Design a protein with these regions (language model features):
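Flexible hinge/capping segments at coil-to-helix
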Residues: 120-132, 136-158
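Short helix-loop capping/hinge motifs at secondary-structure junctions, enriched
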Residues: 118, 139-148, 229-231, 241-247
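Low-acidity, Ser/Thr- and Arg-rich intrinsically disordered low-complexity segments
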Residues: 3, 9-16, 29-35
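Beta-alpha-beta core module
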Residues: 98, 121-125, 129-131, 192-241
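Secondary-structure junction motif
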Residues: 142-143, 156-178, 246, 262
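Short amphipathic alpha-helical coupling segments at ligand-binding clamshell hinges
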Residues: 41-46, 81, 85, 170-171, ...
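Central regulatory/effector-binding core of bacterial HTH transcription factors
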Residues: 67-119, 188
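Alpha-helical "hinge/linker" immediately C-terminal to small N-terminal DNA-binding modules
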Residues: 39-63
Length: 264
């Protein structure tokens, strides 16, 4: 790999850094073999690190030669909002492909949310914090008030958003101190169906306020603030791996700009 560095430096400083890192890691690994007792876990750990850097180096060289490549995205939250950014990015950069996964392993970028901004990983970037509200039909007795208490929610029939860790976390957190939990009337895994059921007055559900108002969902729905148990979620993105392509940096910038406009 060292022989490639002089050639690559003329084209891409980032590519040079990746290849240099791979070279250094390889030689450190070889030198360390003389100083430690070799164990299978030790070799396995370093092998994975070298393989990961090798893959990053290959992608860096490929990009320096004009290959747009793909962005491997782990999307665990805010799919409704991120899809808007993806649509615009793909329209402007049709040569770039995306692969979407729900697991971060092997991905370049993670988009997720946590209940507190303090829980965001150190190398992650906050995109937006939004309030969790209770979505009810406009015909609901409390719709005109804009507020509801945990006690008042106990008699409601909830529409559960299945297979969503963030929703389950909010639900459990709000009702964890209650002696009973509200009835689950329906369970679905589709935001559009959830909205239709709420608009028909068939139940209520917790929703992220900014995400909800930014989506094309039924208008005859009111959002109620939870007075005695306010909840929020913080959406963030986190680069994964040591290689970040120019296209990924552009996509990250567009993410930041899109969410910045939503916060206004």
């Amino acid at each position: 790999p060292g022989s490639l560095i002089p050639v690559i430096k003329r084209n891409s400083p980032i590519t040079s850094d990746i290849v240099t890192g791979l070279t250094n890691t390889f030689f450190i690994f070889i030198i360390s073999l003389r100083r430690v007792i070799i164990t299978i876990p030790y070799v396995h750990c370093n092998r994975l690190r070298i393989l990961a850097l090798s893959e990053d180096a290959a992608r860096a060289v490929s990009e320096s030669l004009g290959d747009a490549g793909e962005i491997r995205l782990c999307l665990r939250s805010s799919a409704v909002l991120v899809s808007n950014v993806l649509k615009d990015f793909i329209h402007e950069h049709p040569h770039v492909s995306f692969s979407i996964s729900s697991e971060p392993k092997g991905c370049d970028l993670l988009i997720d949310s946590v209940s507190s901004a303090y829980d965001i990983p150190d190398n992650a970037h906050l995109l937006m914090t939004e309030e969790i509200c209770l979505a009810v039909s406009s015909s609901h007795p409390l719709a005109h008030t804009g507020h509801i208490s945990v006690e008042q929610m106990m008699d409601e029939k909830f529409i559960d958003l299945a297979d969503t860790q963030s929703y389950a976390g909010v639900f459990n957190s709000i009702f964890c101190k209650c002696k009973k939990t509200p009835q689950i009337a329906y369970s679905c895994n589709d935001y559009i169906l959830q909205g239709k059921l709420i608009s028909l007055g068939l139940g209520v559900s917790f929703v992220a306020s900014v995400t909800w108002t930014s989506s094309s969902l039924p208008e005859n729905i009111s959002l109620l603030h939870i007075d005695d148990c306010p909840h929020f979620r913080s959406i963030y993105y986190q680069p994964l791996g040591s290689f970040c392509s120019e296209n990924q940096r552009i996509f990250e910038h567009q993410l930041e700009e899109y969410f910045k406009k939503l916060n206004k």
